[in-house]
Amino acid sequence: MARFLYLVRHGTADPHDGPLSQVGERQAQLTGQRLKDVPFRGIYHGPLPRAAQTATVIAASLPGVPVIACDLAGDYLPFAPDPGDLPPAFASFLAGFSAAERSEGPKLAAAAFERFARADGEQDAAEQQDAAEQQDTHELLVTHNFLIGWLVSQAMGAPPWRWLGLNQMNCGLTVIAYPPGLPAGLISFNDAGHLPPELRWTGFPAAVRPASG
């Protein structure tokens, strides 16, 4: 049966690498309420406090679902293209990353893709049991803007650098389906229907933010 990967960017944090702000906590609470009826096998989150706390708050609405820390869900550079292949603004942005970040990030991204976006026939033991019982698999990944953009770009067969510009608001919801024998499908992207207007668009670049909605 199909595998469904739910991707949520962490809630607003203040300061940037600290715990969630009050806004971020409310965003996470509403996200948990939105997802409370999904039969998740697990909630995976990156190691940074803002992702871990978002996952914990969401999990309060999903009793019994295990919460699992996962380095693959961290905040890193998923792909480092040749600057000559990029629009100038993107090339300038990527110039700020170190050689180590350019080397290690793509390794983590490749491992994350193998773990969370595997093709049909590459299931782990639990997924094989689900398949034998004709059950869809649902997993929630609480992570960061870059990795969500990377997984979406790969699902759509876009050029490897095109994770750039696929931005997520805090606690926006993206869902990718991996049906057996078929290409991945993007079910929703950056969905914020569970957030009131005053809690939307945080963390989103002002230059491409809609005027309202």
List PLM regions with ranges.
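Acidic, low-complexity terminal tails and accessory targeting/binding regions
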Residues: M1-A2, G64, D75-D85, Q123-T137, ...
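Loop-to-helix element that buttresses phosphate recognition and phosphoryl-transfer chemistry
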Residues: R3-I58, G105-P106, A110
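Internal catalytic-core helix/loop-beta-alpha segment
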Residues: G96-D136
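Phosphate-coordination/substrate-recognition cap region in phosphate-metabolizing enzymes
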Residues: Q29-A100
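Active-site metal-binding loops of divalent metal-dependent hydrolases
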Residues: G11, N145, A192
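Generic beta-sheet signal
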Residues: L5, Q135-F146
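Active-site signature of alpha/beta-hydrolase-fold catalytic machinery across serine-
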Residues: V57, W150, Q154
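Conserved beta-strand termini and adjacent loop/short-helix elements that scaffold enzyme active sites
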Residues: V8, C70-L72, F189
